[in-house]
């Protein structure tokens, strides 16, 4: 056989790919535009995915908060605390649903800081999440200003005012009551955020009565409604620095001048930021001192009887654990294929 004939012979020898294609078996899948788009936009960095989730969730949160505040002002419902509280609480719940499965949905720089201090969140993630949250709040404020632009002009005649009958500053940020002193305002922000963290940590504690993940956003939303209904009279209960500071910067750019920062002689604008961070750390420390750090070492199994018997004395606890072990052993024996048959 010549060299040329040998080459043609080997070219015509069927390969395994030929047989696979002949019987319809192939590992090559045709990628449609959806698969191509997903592959092209897939982010493999867990940190970046978390930042993206925080950004989108805070954006959604701010749309609901600022939208509800604008609706209250435009419809003369400024004093309707329940309306604003329910809107804010449900907005938080929806935002937690958006990012809960990706980043944990911190939504709040103060909450992220408290979790980092307690060792529940890495400092790297904390810093980048905080940046994402501030950016999202600013972008959401820009978006809502464009969305509400004609309504704002219809309401105030195109002249941006802070307070009074045509004042719209409360759409963007929180402001204290005229009678509130600076030190009381600071204590107010610390107290509100501390309460927030105590309950949030309780809800996220697997050794406590943690709600199911699917219900957790609703529970957190109910918490926000409760705090807003009870602790918002003094200064609006911001509890979230990104929700307050970023829109305040935007309102400065949107025609309100320096007044958003000049309230109370420039002693207010930093209070919701500093007070919220301090309150979050204090609230986290209080929960760890009273609850989180007091769990016995043998309560890792949250479904066991012993974890539900935390307040019992040691002897009773031991007896209940023995009963629990006997029950588990008997169930295991019945379900085992090697168990003796009587």
From Swiss-Prot:
Protein location: Cell membrane
Record's bilayer topology term: Multi-pass membrane protein
Residues carrying sugar: 166, 314
Source organism superkingdom: Eukaryota
Keyword check for Cell membrane: yes
Region of interest: Disordered: 302-342
Inducers of expression: Transcript abundance is low but expression is slightly up-regulated in the inactive stage (during anhydrobiois).
Keyword Glycoprotein: yes
Family: Belongs to the MIP/aquaporin (TC 1.A.8) family.
Protein's name according to its UniProt entry: Aquaporin-8
Organism lineage: Eukaryota, Metazoa, Ecdysozoa, Tardigrada, Eutardigrada
């Amino acid at each position: 056989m010549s060299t040329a004939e040998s080459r043609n012979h080997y070219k015509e020898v069927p390969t395994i790919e030929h047989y696979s294609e002949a019987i319809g078996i192939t590992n090559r899948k045709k990628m449609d535009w959806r698969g191509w788009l997903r592959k092209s936009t897939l982010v493999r960095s867990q940190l970046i995915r978390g930042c993206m989730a925080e950004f989108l969730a805070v954006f959604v949160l701010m749309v609901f908060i600022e939208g509800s505040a604008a609706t209250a002002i435009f419809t003369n419902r400024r004093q309707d605390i329940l309306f604003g509280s329910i809107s804010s609480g449900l907005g938080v719940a929806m935002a937690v649903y958006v990012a809960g499965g990706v980043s944990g949905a911190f939504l709040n720089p103060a909450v992220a800081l408290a979790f980092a201090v307690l060792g529940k969140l890495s400092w790297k993630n904390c810093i980048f999440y905080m940046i994402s949250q501030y950016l999202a709040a600013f972008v959401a404020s820009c978006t809502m200003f464009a969305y509400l632009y004609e309504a704002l002009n219809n309401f105030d005649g195109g002249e941006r005012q802070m307070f009074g009958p045509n004042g719209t500053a409360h759409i963007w940020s929180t402001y204290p009551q005229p009678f509130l002193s600076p030190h009381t305002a600071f204590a107010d922000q610390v107290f509100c955020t501390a309460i927030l963290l105590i309950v949030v940590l309780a809800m996220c504690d697997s050794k406590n009565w943690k709600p199911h993940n699917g219900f957790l956003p609703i529970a957190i939303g109910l918490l926000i409604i409760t705090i807003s209904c009870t602790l918002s009279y003094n200064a609006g209960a911001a509890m979230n620095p990104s929700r307050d500071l970023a829109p305040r910067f935007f309102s400065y750019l949107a025609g309100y001048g320096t007044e958003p920062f000049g309230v109370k002689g420039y002693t207010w604008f930093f209070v919701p930021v500093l007070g919220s961070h301090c309150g979050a750390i204090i609230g986290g420390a209080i929960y760890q001192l009273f609850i989180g750090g007091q769990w016995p070492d043998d309560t890792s199994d949250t479904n066991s009887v012993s974890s539900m018997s935390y307040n019992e004395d040691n002897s009773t606890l031991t007896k209940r654990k023995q009963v629990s072990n006997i029950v588990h052993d008997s169930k295991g024996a019945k379900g085992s294929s090697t168990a003796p048959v009587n």
